[in-house]
Swiss-Prot record:
GO MF terms, alphabetically ordered: ATP binding; ATP-dependent protein folding chaperone; unfolded protein binding
Keywords, comma-separated and alphabetical: ATP-binding, Chaperone, Nucleotide-binding, Phosphoprotein, Stress response
Organism in which the protein naturally occurs: Allorhizobium ampelinum (strain ATCC BAA-846 / DSM 112012 / S4) (Agrobacterium vitis (strain S4))
Pfam families on file: HSP70 (PF00012)
Protein's gene: dnaK
InterPro entries, per the entry: ATPase_NBD, Chaperone_DnaK, Heat_shock_70_CS, HSP70_C_sf, HSP70_peptide-bd_sf, Hsp_70_fam
Protein name in the entry: Chaperone protein DnaK
Region (Disordered): 599-638
NCBIfam families the record matches: PRK00290.1, PRK05183.1, prok_dnaK
Modified residues (Phosphothreonine): 198
Residue ranges with Acidic residues bias: 621-630
Length: 638
């Protein structure tokens, strides 16, 4: 039975895990790392880089290196948070055809779901390389505070990547699964998850295989990226004070600042002071300028104090919604890379009145929880019951633009709820059902998820028709809404798709693009491997011709030189073809066999002339040949 994998699709880093017996195992990627940067880059020659290779070239290619796109997923272009993000990233954020926020690289627009799909593809390939089999199904995590549009977009990303997403699971819930799988005694825990781009807090009751989420809260635009940018702004302001040059207008300098800020932030979690040193950051008429600055932990904490404090209100709201106090919490589990920051741990300790639990790896625990949930769905993990909640209230717009709730936040899912409404005018023959999600009293202040019309109502006085509106939320937190006229039996329903969102046709097109890209990546790799082998053979053959060319006939030597020239030409063409290179490599190997034979005979003759024991010289020849091949292989893999 094919394995179902668990993927933590993070803002900054992603991670993939699979059940190995009774334990969740985090899988290392092709670079040997357990987490993969959530970055995608497009080079000038059309190559697509994902993960660490994309991160390595970000400084030299800032406008085409896309990162933190999870913060844009499922968001409209006009969203104030998108507006804020535009000034902080070096790549263009554009308005998609459907009105959503998209990103642009090498002049082409991509939806955040498409970019996320490229990262998911990398995770899928990582798992396939480890398992030695195709992977087609996955459980993917999302921030608990993601709304319906963001969840749907994440599911779309999985589909584009060629994965059937069996379940969308909340990140804090996944972390609780990994933390509490072996715990038998009942506990009330809080999962404090401060990641690269989002913050979640969930209160759960766990024990004997039952994981019941009591409440969740958070901020989908608060995370490590904000801490980095706060430091970038400080460094740029200090540099401007000293040198009078605005670094934020220089995209290359901005990317270098961002990398330095992230590095300094990490170092300050374990040391009291760090030095930021960026030589040749910019230049003016007087010559090159360098940025050198010492930064203390206290200064950094002062810069980001308001960001850390922004996590407090959601924590208090979650405790209140769960009907517990901080004293009732038995354990606070820290999740997400930012939870390593001493200031964050200090605030958590003050808030909950106890030392937070640091026994889980904050970068890996979410993926492990996703793998456990995958195991539950597959039937490999027994006696685990997961009861999650919807993070935001759901309802419809009623007379006067009021938001009428049908399902309150923190309701256990899956769930279904109906309510009867009527018309506002006499002889009204159609009603528009506008579905929103949020906590504000007026519908316009909440997130509009979608709308649909129920038509063909018989003419009646206002207030007479009975229209039953039903909300149905599945285990992924994705909403379906139906409206039925009880008089005529007419019914209309929609599976809520973000008011922008991707249509099925969009997704199918992106699936085909993703498949074509995967094929192109495969071909590119085949070309690189063929070129490595060819260059290695050319090098060793040219060396042999130089040393022993006089041992073969002029015709044989010319055939070898022609084969070398043909192979070089095949490698150096603007669009190299792997099969062509392989065929010409084979030709060169065949024509150079006579040279090898001549070398062998020549060395045997020399051995005979010296009168030494031929067996001894044979060993030497074999060794020499072996060394040559080994040397070639070394060059091939370099």
């Amino acid at each position: 039975m094919a394995k179902v994998i668990g993927i933590d699709l993070g803002t900054t880093n992603s991670c993939v895990s699979v059940m190995d017996g009774k334990d969740a195992k985090v899988i290392e990627n092709s670079e040997g790392a357990r987490t993969t940067p959530s970055m995608v880059a497009f080079s000038d020659d059309g190559e697509r880089l994902v993960g660490q290779p994309a991160k390595r070239q970000a400084v030299t290619n800032p406008t085409n290196t896309l990162f933190a796109v999870k913060r844009l997923i499922g968001r409209r272009y006009e969203d104030p948070t998108v507006e804020k993000d535009k000034g902080l990233v070096p790549f263009p954020i554009i308005k998609g055809d459907n009105g959503d926020a998209w990103v642009e690289a090498q002049g082409k627009g991509y939806s955040p779901a498409q970019i996320s799909a490229m990262i998911l593809q990398k995770m899928k390939e990582t798992a396939e390389a480890y398992l030695g089999e195709k992977v087609e199904k996955a459980v993917i995590t999302v921030p608990a505070y993601f709304n319906d549009a963001q969840r749907q977009a994440t599911k779309d990303a999985g589909r584009i990547a060629g994965l059937e997403v069996l379940r969308i699971i909340n990140e804090p819930t996944a972390a609780a699964l990994a933390y509490g799988l072996d715990k038998t005694e009942g506990k009330t825990i809080a999962v404090y998850d401060l990641g690269g781009g989002t913050f979640d807090i969930s209160v759960l009751e766990i024990g004997d295989g039952v994981f019941e989420v009591k409440s969740t809260n958070g901020d989908t635009f608060l995370g490590g990226e904000d801490f980095d940018m706060r430091l970038v702004e400080y460094l740029a302001a200090e540099f401007k004070k000293e040198q009078g040059i605005e670094l934020k207008n220089d995209k290359l300098a901005l990317q270098r600042l961002k990398e330095a800020a992230e590095k300094a932030k990490i170092e300050l979690s374990s040391s009291q002071q760090t030095e930021i040193n960026l030589p040749f950051i910019t230049a003016d008429a007087s010559g090159p300028k360098h940025l050198t600055m010492k930064l203390t932990r206290a200064k950094f904490e002062n810069l980001v104090d308001d960001l850390v404090q922004r996590t407090v209100a959601p924590c208090k709201a979650a405790l209140k919604d769960a009907g517990v106090t901080a004293a009732d919490i038995d354990e606070v589990v820290l999740v997400g890379g930012m939870s390593r920051m001493p200031k964050v741990q200090e605030v958590v300790k003050q808030l909950f009145g106890k030392e937070p639990h640091k026994g889980v790896n904050p970068d890996e625990v979410v993926a492990m929880g996703a793998a456990i949930q995958a195991g539950v769905l597959q039937g490999d993990v027994k006696d685990v019951l997961l009861l999650d909640v919807t993070p935001l209230s759901l309802g419809i717009e009623t007379l006067g633009g009021v938001f009428t709730r049908l399902i309150d936040r923190n309701t256990t899912i899956p769930t279904k709820k109906s309510q009867v409404f009527s018309t506002a005018d006499d002889n009204q023959q159609a009603v528009t059902i506008r579905v929103s999600q949020g906590e504000r009293e007026m519908a316009q202040d909440n997130k509009l998820l979608g709308q649909f019309d129920l038509v063909g109502l018989p003419p009646s006085p206002r207030g007479v028709p009975q229209i039953e509106v039903t909300f149905d939320i599945d285990a992924n937190g994705i909403v379906q809404v139906s409206a039925k006229d009880k008089g005529t039996g007419k019914e209309q329903q929609i599976r809520i798709q973000a008011s922008g969102g991707l249509s099925d046709a969009d997704i199918e097109k992106m699936v085909k693009d993703a498949e074509a890209n995967a094929e192109a990546d495969k071909n590119r790799r085949a070309v690189v491997e063929a070129k490595n082998q060819a260059e290695s053979l050319i090098h060793s053959t040219e060396k042999s011709v130089k040393d022993y060319g006089d041992k073969v006939s002029a015709d044989d030597r010319k055939a070898i030189e022609d084969a070398i020239a043909a192979l070089k030409s095949s490698i150096e063409t603007s669009e190299p073809n792997a099969e062509d290179i392989q065929a010409k490599t084979q030709t060169l190997m065949e024509v150079s066999m006579k040279l090898g034979q001549a070398i062998y005979e020549s060395q045997q003759a020399e051995g005979g002339a010296e009168g030494g024991p031929s067996g001894h010289h044979d060993d030497g020849i074999v060794d020499a040949d072996y060394e040559e091949v080994k040397d070639d292989n070394t060059k091939k893999s370099a």
